[in-house]
A protein has these predicted regions:
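ABC transporter nucleotide-binding domains
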Residues: 1-621
């Protein structure tokens, strides 16, 4: 066995608050070996990120380590150090140097006021005894290693290919300017994937022994996620680093981890080799996490959730009691049922018709005039039948969200037609447009920013009723709100609480209840589960399907996660650069994708299958 570089023993972390104490970590233990990747997986609130912050010595007040040890070996054959007992000044010598961390949201991790070069150089000089010019070269080398910058040879080749008359003596200067131009760029000028590469370059710039990656790909598209995972894996192997990879998605863990620790409510409930965890999970929580992710190979009527595998209750003394359950096998939707459903839609008149729709955003010139338009939606046409779910997939920037908001007239189109129930609504204004809002609703991506934090949940759900004068009395409206909250799986007394008092999944249920308040016919779900843990995501997806059946709803389901879209959709449109590049039934798109772009999206989905786990281990060998 390889040398142990980090060993956590019986670690306990508590957060005292208002006379109550929340135990975020309850005696967790694990070991990390040189060159190994340990995956830590669990839902929000399980203690994953608190574990990382405790190792880094970055726990926020009032969080405190109340017990246990964190033993770190800074050099081979050196004595281990207990990081818990290390004075803050000595801890600073290791943090960012020997132990580095990549955070979940790169945009909030970088200072928008400074260019990326300044921030990289600052981090390097803080941990290494080098001059500013040396730090600059290390920063450039780091950006090349994470493939944000091409190598010197590739830059030279680019210049020689674009200009046959180029003076070779000018190449060194051009290469230098090209590299320095990247250092001069600011965070807002880079995409999410590029920003995460900057964060990775910063983390590895001081040659850490341990790299902690806390949900480093959660905010990224599946294709960008796949390239970042491959990059992290490559860097780890080339540098022989030990790595802790934290995520809520077991599918991702299967792509990168050698060992896995599954966390639930501050405890490690199962741990072992990655292939063992995926081929033969023992704990009901692990089984639930694996089962709740939509499969590309099967089409169940509903997804299994963690609650199908276990129940958890706290005793009067605060002891957590987990009771395993045997889940009922999910009923598969047959090929005949799918064909009959599609045939039924084909016989119906469209509810929504889109004809040659174009949406552009003006690019301003130096003097404020419009130079040109950036076409977010460029000549899109399709129909949506009553009762069906049309999936809309593509990477960030492909135009899917702009298209969804344009259909609701939240963004004005440049040209084309939006026809709803045989009425052209493209130019509707005033009262006719307001009446249309009753029929067409949207559930946004982030449930927290969708709800006013100053409004009680009941008032938020009631607001559409007041705007459209629905319900004769306040009592009638409150009864309607209570009915809606109960229908989405919340108690009626939830109407007296504020958004911050709910979990992410519960907040999204509130948003769904609000979208149903006016009995709409058509709802756009815009990345409405992408901000949720996979287990909560499964619950919300099941709810959306139930509501569609109960209320005869028509959905457009927008997402970058193709496995989720396949579970939800009857037909799928694939968007790229403002255009529909492929469309068909959900089954045909997945079984026989025609376009290379669609094939790339499908190949990038982390499945968590035993075969993918075995392939990962073969690559590692």
């Amino acid at each position: 066995m390889r040398e142990t570089v980090l060993e956590v023993r019986n670690l306990q972390v508590e957060f005292p608050s208002d006379g109550n104490t929340v135990r975020a970590l309850d005696g967790i233990s694990f070991a990390l070996h040189r060159g190994e990747t340990l995956g830590i997986v669990g839902e929000s609130g399980s203690g994953k990120s608190v574990t990382a912050l405790a190792v880094m010595g970055l726990l926020q007040t009032p969080g405190i380590v109340t017990g246990g040890e964190i033993w770190f070996r800074p050099q081979e054959n050196a004595n281990s150090i207990d990081l818990v007992k290390l004075p803050p000044k000595q801890m600073q010598l290791h943090r960012g140097g020997d132990i580095a961390m990549i955070f979940q949201e790169p945009m909030s991790s970088l200072n928008p006021v400074y260019n990326i070069g300044f921030q990289l150089i600052e981090a390097i000089m803080r941990h290494q005894n080098v001059s500013a010019s040396q730090a600059k070269q290390i920063a450039i080398a780091g950006l090349q290693e994470v493939k944000l910058l091409p190598s010197d040879e590739e830059i030279q080749q680019q210049y020689t290919e674009t200009s046959s008359k180029l003076d070779p003596s000018k190449l060194p200067r051009l290469v230098k300017e090209h590299k320095e131009a990247m250092l001069e760029r600011y965070p807002h000028e880079l995409s999410g994937g590029q920003l995460q590469r900057v964060m990775i370059a910063m983390a590895i710039s001081c040659n850490p022994l341990i790299l902690i990656a806390d949900e480093p790909t959660t905010a990224l598209d599946v294709t960008v996620q796949a390239t970042i995972l491959e990059l992290i894996r490559e860097l780890q192997q080339n540098r022989d680093m030990a790595m802790i990879f934290i995520t809520h998605d077991l599918g991702l863990i299967s792509e990168i981890a050698d060992e896995v620790a599954v966390m639930y409510r501050g405890k490690v409930v199962e741990s072992g080799a990655s292939d063992q965890i995926f081929s033969s999970p023992q704990h009901p929580y692990t089984k639930g996490l694996i089962a709740c992710r939509p499969s590309l190979d099967r089409r169940p009527q509903k997804l299994l959730t963690v609650s199908d595998y276990m129940s958890a209750e706290e005793t009067a003394t605060g002891q957590l009691v987990i009771q395993a359950k045997e889940p009922a096998q999910p009923i598969e939707v047959t090929t005949e049922e799918i064909a009959a459903r599609l045939a039924n839609f084909n016989e119906k008149e469209p509810l929504l018709q889109i004809r040659n729709l174009k949406v552009g955003f003006p690019v301003r010139g130096v003097f404020g005039g419009t130079k040109r338009y950036n076409m977010a939606v460029n000549g899109v046409s399709f129909d949506v039948k009553p009762g069906e779910t049309l999936g809309l997939v593509g990477e960030s920037g492909c135009g899917k969200t702009t298209l969804g908001r344009t259909l609701l007239r939240l963004i004005e189109p440049m040209s084309g037609q939006i026809i709803f129930e045989k009425q052209d609504i493209t130019s509707l204004k005033g009262e006719p447009l307001q009446k249309l809002r009753r029929e067409m609703q949207i559930v946004f991506q982030n449930p927290f920013s969708s709800l006013d934090p100053r409004m009680k949940v009941g008032d938020a759900v009631m607001e559409p009723l007041l705007i459209h004068s629905v319900g004769k009395t306040k009592q009638k409206r409150r009864e309607r709100v209570a009915e809606l909250l109960e229908r989405v799986g919340l108690n009626a007394d939830a109407m007296n609480r504020y958004p911050h008092q709910f979990s992410g999944g519960q907040r999204q249920r509130v948003c769904i209840a609000r979208s149903l308040a006016l009995n709409p016919k058509f709802i756009i779900c815009d990345e409405s589960v992408s901000a949720l843990d996979v287990s909560v995501q499964a619950q919300v997806l099941n709810l959306l399907k139930e509501l569609q059946s109960d209320f005869q709803l028509t959905y457009i389901f927008i997402s970058h996660d193709l496995s989720v879209v396949k579970f939800m959709s009857d037909r799928i449109l694939v968007m790229n650069r403002g255009q529909i590049v492929e469309q068909g039934t959900a089954e045909s798109i997945y079984q026989n994708p025609k376009e290379e772009y669609t094939q790339k999206l499908i190949a990038a989905i982390p499945t968590g299958s035993a075969e993918r786990v075995r392939n990962h281990h073969l690559r590692a060998l």
